[in-house]
């Protein structure tokens, strides 16, 4: 596993997962921490993939919180160590990226790997009806044939939806004022 093959956002999520483990005083860095970091993302890529796959993000979050509360807590200034299941998720994500023709491991591949590797995170995803196949179909729909060929690949996904307004959709819903005086 080479973290240099991960996109900037994917690296950030791995670091966020470690921060979650430290904040919760957990001894081990688990796939559940990574899934929590993905779901709590302010840009919501993982949450939108889950929603597009007809999954319930709130249900996953509740299940995750109950799993994380059961983890062993340690006192003091202890760095959590990476659990073998966490490392397996990262390896699986790298394998998935290679199979799909990506040069970098993107965030969505981390989510797919979480749905594949046996862990509490997989149980949380399954509790909301999420499978790796559903996530993959959502990824293919979102990417529209593009691959992750740069360290900032996720920034290009759904750029139009992020930075533009769909005036036709807004007009159909009656959210814009009618144009008066049109010739």
Task: Give residue spans per PLM region.
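Histone-fold recognition with a strong bias for associated Lys/Arg-rich disordered tails
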Residues: 1-183
């Amino acid at each position: 596993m080479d973290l240099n093959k991960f996109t900037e956002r994917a690296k950030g999520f791995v670091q966020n997962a470690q921060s979650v483990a430290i904040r919760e005083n957990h001894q081990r860095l688990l796939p559940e921490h990574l899934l929590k970091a993905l779901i709590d993302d302010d840009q919501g890529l993982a949450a939108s993939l889950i929603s597009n796959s007809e999954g319930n993000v709130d249900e996953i979050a509740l299940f995750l919180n109950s799993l994380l509360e059961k983890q062993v807590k340690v006192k003091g200034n202890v760095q959590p160590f990476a659990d073998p299941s966490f490392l397996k998720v990262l390896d699986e994500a790298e394998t998935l990226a290679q199979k799909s023709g990506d040069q970098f491991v993107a965030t969505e591949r981390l989510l797919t790997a979480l749905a594949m590797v046996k862990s509490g995170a997989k149980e949380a995803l399954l509790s909301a009806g999420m499978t790796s196949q559903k996530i993959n179909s959502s990824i293919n729909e979102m990417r529209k044939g593009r691959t992750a060929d740069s360290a900032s690949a996720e920034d290009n996904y759904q750029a139009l939806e992020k930075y533009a307004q769909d005036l036709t959709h807004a007009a159909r819903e009656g959210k814009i004022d009618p144009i008066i005086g049109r010739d």
